Amino acid sequence: MLKEKKDKEKNIYMIPKILKSSKSKSILKKPKWLKIKLPSNLKKINKIKKILKKNFLHSVCEEANCPNLPECFNNGTATFMILGSICTRKCPFCAVTKGRAQKIDKNEPKKILDIVIKLKLTYVVLTSVARDDLKDGGAKHFSKCIYEIRKKKNIKVEILVPDFRGKEKIALKIFNKFPPDIFNHNIENVPRLYSLIRPGADYIKSLNLLYQFKKICPNIPTKSGLMLGLGEKKKEIISVLKDLKSVGVSIVTIGQYLQPSKNHLLVQKYITPKEFKNFEYIALSLGFSKVFCGPLVRSSYHADRQYLSF
């Protein structure tokens, strides 16, 4: 069991001792290929941060401490995190704040559309915290955002959704009426490590969510992502890729897990660029339409390019 550490500001949760830094377990040194060069001009980055803050909106880029934030913000792109900034789950790999969920901002869909227009975006990615407190898991709010954004023509919408634990049927019924252009749900890692990495989630149910969406919306691409470096084995990764292919997933992303803070899971291994290239080859050989592999690859990193190349 994960023991909650009382910290009202950061809402940090204690993780198992075997995965925390200690004298017996040294922290792996970050390799050179993971070093990021900050852009010289921070004007666009600060502009997006200011706009989001002013409208009380959130980006997963900021909330999850994404390493690609400087590049994405500098290119004028961001992944909107809807339904608040506090997650009802306690996944020990994730930097997003955990705790009691916030009240839904009913004006959020319109606020997002305003920003989309202001930033002249043509591709929008929506994601959310897990909302186990809601009867539909937050699916209706996703659909409202999709509906609002599509008031502006020629904008593609990708959604990266939680697993809607116990509310999958309700959520899928809603998405059938208001489908996105790409449906994304991250499998994250291998089933053997699920109880450690995704407590409260279920590997088979995540696969089934992807399968059921594809069943009701066969013409809409489905997508999923993995993060490596948490102790998984190569054969397990290949097995997960085969499972994803079997449920109709056509786009897959594979990146390196990076420890957000000392209070999160330790990195067990840094995967080399060569190894990522090998996984890309394996995934393509399994029949995926598009595969994006690399140390800094994230589910919504260059999502617009992923869609355009589909």
Swiss-Prot record:
**Which E.C. number(s) belong to this protein?**
2.8.1.8
Keywords for the protein's UniProt record, in alphabetical order: 4Fe-4S, Cytoplasm, Iron, Iron-sulfur, Metal-binding, S-adenosyl-L-methionine, Transferase
**Listed SMART domains:** Elp3 (SM00729)
Could you tell me one molecular function GO term of this UniProt entry? Answer: metal ion binding
Domain named Radical SAM core: residues? 73-289
Q: Name one Pfam family in it.
A: LIAS_N
Q: Name one GO cellular component term.
A: cytoplasm
Q: Which domain of life is it from?
A: Bacteria
> Which cofactor is essential here?
[4Fe-4S] cluster
Task: Write out the residues that bind [4Fe-4S] cluster 1.
Answer: C61, C66, C72, S300
The primary location reported for this protein is cytoplasm
Its recorded reaction(s) are: [[Fe-S] cluster scaffold protein carrying a second [4Fe-4S](2+) cluster] + N(6)-octanoyl-L-lysyl-[protein] + 2 oxidized [2Fe-2S]-[ferredoxin] + 2 S-adenosyl-L-methionine + 4 H(+) = [[Fe-S] cluster scaffold protein] + N(6)-[(R)-dihydrolipoyl]-L-lysyl-[protein] + 4 Fe(3+) + 2 hydrogen sulfide + 2 5'-deoxyadenosine + 2 L-methionine + 2 reduced [2Fe-2S]-[ferredoxin]
Q: Where in the cell is it found?
A: Cytoplasm
Q: How is the cofactor bound?
A: Binds 2 [4Fe-4S] clusters per subunit. One cluster is coordinated with 3 cysteines and an exchangeable S-adenosyl-L-methionine.
Enumerate the InterPro entries for this protein: Aldolase_TIM, Elp3/MiaA/NifB-like_rSAM, LIAS_N, Lipoyl_synth, rSAM
Pathways per UniProt: Protein modification; protein lipoylation via endogenous pathway; protein N(6)-(lipoyl)lysine from octanoyl-[acyl-carrier-protein]: step 2/2
Which residues are noted in the entry as [4Fe-4S] cluster 2-binding? C87, C91, C94
Q: Which HAMAP family match?
A: Lipoyl_synth
What family does this chain come from, according to its entry? Belongs to the radical SAM superfamily. Lipoyl synthase family.
* Protein name, UniProt field: Lipoyl synthase
Origin species? Buchnera aphidicola subsp. Cinara cedri (strain Cc)
